[in-house]
């Protein structure tokens, strides 16, 4: 009888805890991100402000004013110029190239290695456009591994309703958005 009572108490406690922490707040890494079918690369080109990102090694020195500038190269690759402000107040930048991986240009591989080293295998990161609004003003970018995620906007600020909508899309794709860091944009 005591064993039955203990089992009931434990089961009830687990049920109560599960109600306090709904499953929707946790990342489901079994859910695979899906890139949009296609993007108009000419409309996508230009300056984007980072609104939020998942922490990563490559951005460890960036504390504010992170932007990405995309340009179309003659060979149909995409020029990438990422810039940010460091803790010391210095602007730093990194130049790279993105290589389209599908006909719709929504899946790319990006390399920031010097041009002579970009041929080295396994040195390019995934850049998938997971969502973009029809006017190309807001975009959600990630990849299949759930390691990288960015919310980008054409303006330095994004209204909360739009931010929450893109956050929900990221959750639906299995990203742990509790780790997302909002980017300070002072320019």
Question: Where are the language model's segments positioned?
Answer:
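A cross-family signal for key residues in well-ordered alpha-helices
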Residues: 18
């Amino acid at each position: 009888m005591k064993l039955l009572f203990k089992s009931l108490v434990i089961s009830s406690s687990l049920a109560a805890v599960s109600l306090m922490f709904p499953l929707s707040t946790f990342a489901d890494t079994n859910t695979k991100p899906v890139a949009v079918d296609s993007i108009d690369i000419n409309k996508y080109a230009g300056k984007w402000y980072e609104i939020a990102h998942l922490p990563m090694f490559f951005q460890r020195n960036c504390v504010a004013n992170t932007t990405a500038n995309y340009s179309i190269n003659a060979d149909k690759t995409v020029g990438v110029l990422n810039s940010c402000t460091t803790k010391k107040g210095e602007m730093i930048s990194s130049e790279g190239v993105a290589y389209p991986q599908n006909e719709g240009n929504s899946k790319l591989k990006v390399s920031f290695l010097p041009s002579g080293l970009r041929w080295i295998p396994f040195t390019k990161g995934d850049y998938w456009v997971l969502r973009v609004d029809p006017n190309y003003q807001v975009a959600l970018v990630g990849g299949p591994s759930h390691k990288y995620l960015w919310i980008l906007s054409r303006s330095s600020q994004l209204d909360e309703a739009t931010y929450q909508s893109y956050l929900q899309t990221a959750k639906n794709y299995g990203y742990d958005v509790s780790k997302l860091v909002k980017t300070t944009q002072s320019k």
